[in-house]
Amino acid sequence: MVKIRLKRVGKKFNVIYKIVVADSRAPRDGRFIEEVGNYNPHSKSLNLKKEAIISWLNQGVKPSDTVKRLLTREKVWEEFTSLKNNKN
């Protein structure tokens, strides 16, 4: 199963997360299919490739709980659900 989740990078006590599409069986910091954004929890900055994320969500990829919360904060999740409802 493929998921959108966080990959931890950076130094100790100075963590940055990459938002990646990865197989759920792969290790947290292991192989991934595509990088679709990054998140810095210290400065609360979030950069997303919205088109790529919506494309993956349309293919049936499930986000982790934390990624879903970040997508909701940036209004990407609402955009995806509205596109999905308009399609049906």
From Swiss-Prot:
Belongs to the bacterial ribosomal protein bS16 family. One of its GO terms (cellular component) is small ribosomal subunit. It comes from Mycoplasmopsis pulmonis (strain UAB CTIP) (Mycoplasma pulmonis). This is Small ribosomal subunit protein bS16. NCBIfam families: S16 (TIGR00002). The gene is rpsP. Keywords: Ribonucleoprotein, Ribosomal protein. Pfam families: Ribosomal_S16. One of its GO terms (biological process) is translation. The lineage of its organism: Bacteria, Bacillati, Mycoplasmatota, Mycoplasmoidales, Metamycoplasmataceae. InterPro entries: Ribosomal_bS16, Ribosomal_bS16_CS, Ribosomal_bS16_dom_sf. PROSITE patterns: RIBOSOMAL_S16 (PS00732). One of its GO terms (molecular function) is structural constituent of ribosome.
